[in-house]
A protein has these predicted regions:
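Short glycine/proline-enriched loop/turn "hinge" motifs that connect secondary-structure elements
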Residues: 151-154, 349, 385-388
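C-terminal amphipathic alpha-helical interaction region
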Residues: 410, 423-447
């Protein structure tokens, strides 16, 4: 049976058309590409992002305190827990009402300003864990048009979280400037209403954020993997440190599974191999991410960036043009909304697109959709009502969406995408297309 279970999570790939021969070919490729060695390199801090000569250690953000992981001779886990401790202290003070605005009133609104991974991940996680939010606090995530958000807020009780890895991102700093000017114009009197999350602490301080209100992360944390770091401080303020640690624990459990399970019993590896078969053997150009729990409203957008920015590459690590296809198009929507928008195309369109369902185990509607997409519903008498079937799908099932299961789901996809990058021979941890676009935009702005 094509089902793998781990820690209450079920991965069902019985509705795919992955043959034994396909699987053997891909597992052979995994060994040829030294997946086991590359996996070890990532977890132990080797500088596998060759473009920037950086380690790739988002996994260290959720490591146990007792672990030792070294980059350039320095134990990074100790630094992670130092920042986590500061985050916890700050979050506890905001939640308890001890951290007040300039007029002495407790904080009621947290405005998180960021873009890309500094926005999509934290927004998704904070929305997914809404059941755990502090009743006094409301989070507002902004990447553009902060003016609309500011109309609803009071400067006395608003805290701004400015997130930029370099603290030079023009879109983010532009929105932060608007927020600062609004704050001052409304009578705001204290810089304590602003905190900064960045690699560039000096840049945040120069911008005007008090140093005690800055929270560090590191160059070995990619933006699209940064929610586990201080970038997640808005989430921690809303859900509390205890739930944030449970979220980290979920990711850590998948890390252990990914490192230890045999390839064909390894959920992220099998997710990757199935995705590669769909892309390279069956030539499917895309896949749809369809979560059914309403808490996962923003999951497809988070996944879209994670996958397409990581594996949307056409050059191998050796600088040569890739042979064949790499990362697919990723799109998606909540299950019931998707059923009443583009499921018509999925069921009866001329293109076949695999679906990756994420659901709770009690959702029969999702399983019914997967069955019909796979098996079809024949109706020769009325061709317009004929459902041809032959549409592959996978199911990731959890009992419920909790901080722990959310962490597990996210880590599964992170590792899936890493495996695919290894097998395609590309660097999943740079984004040269994005960076070149920024440089060109800056040049045009100067003209």
């Amino acid at each position: 049976m094509k089902v793998i279970k781990f820690n209450g999570l079920v991965f069902d790939y019985s509705r795919t058309f992955l043959s034994k021969s396909n699987l053997q070919t891909l597992t052979k490729l995994a060994r040829q590409r030294d997946l086991i060695g590359r996996r070890k390199d990532m977890f132990t801090g080797e500088k596998i992002n060759k473009t920037s000569n950086w380690a790739v250690l988002h996994t260290a953000l959720r490591a146990k305190r007792s672990e030792k992981i070294y980059v350039d001779g320095k134990d990074v886990v100790a630094g992670v827990y130092e920042v986590l401790g500061r985050m916890e202290d700050f979050s506890d003070r905001v939640r308890s009402g001890k951290y007040c605005g300039y007029s002495g009133k407790p904080i009621t609104d947290v405005v998180h300003i960021g873009i890309g991974g500094s926005y999509l991940g934290p927004r998704m996680v904070t929305r997914a864990l809404a059941a755990h939010h502090h009743p006094r606090l409301t989070a507002h995530f902004v990447s553009d048009d902060i003016q609309e958000t500011l109309k609803r807020l009071s400067p006395e009780t608003t805290l701004f979280v400015v997130v930029s890895k370099t603290f030079t991102t023009p879109e983010t700093l532009g929105q932060a400037e608007i927020a600062y000017n609004w704050f001052k114009a409304k009578g705001g009197k204290s810089a304590k209403h602003f905190i900064g999350v960045t690699v560039n602490i000096a840049g945040a301080v120069k911008w005007g954020i008090p140093e005690e209100n800055t929270f560090k992360f590191w160059d070995w944390v990619g933006g699209r993997y940064s929610t586990w770091s201080a970038v997640g401080i808005t989430t921690m303020m809303l859900v509390g440190a205890e739930n944030f640690y449970k979220f980290l624990d979920g990711g850590r459990k998948i890390d252990a599974h990914f490192r230890k399970a045999p390839l064909t019993k390894n959920i992220p590896v099998m997710m990757a191999l199935i995705g590669m078969a769909h892309r390279n053997f069956f030539k499917y150009p895309a896949y749809a991410s369809i979560p059914y729990p309403p808490q996962l409203e923003f999951f497809p957008l988070w996944l879209q960036q994670l996958d397409m920015e990581s594996n949307g590459k056409s050059v191998e690590l050796n600088g040569k043009k890739v042979k064949g296809s790499t990362g697919p198009i990723v799109f998606g929507l909540l299950g019931y909304d998707a059923q009443h928008s583009f499921f018509q195309w999925l069921h009866q369109g001329t293109d076949i697109v695999p679906i990756e369902f994420v659901t709770t185990m009690d959702n029969r509607n999702c399983i019914f959709q997967a069955n019909i997409l796979h098996a079809g519903e024949k109706n020769a008498a009325e061709p317009q009502n004929n459902l041809p079937g032959g549409r592959p799908s996978t199911l990731l099932m959890v009992k419920e969406v909790t901080p722990e299961t959310l962490g597990m789901l996210m880590a599964l996809y992170e590792h899936k995408i890493f495996v695919q990058g290894v097998l395609w021979g590309i660097n999943s941890f740079d984004q040269c297309g994005v960076e070149m676009g920024k440089l060109i935009a800056k040049k045009l702005a100067k003209k």
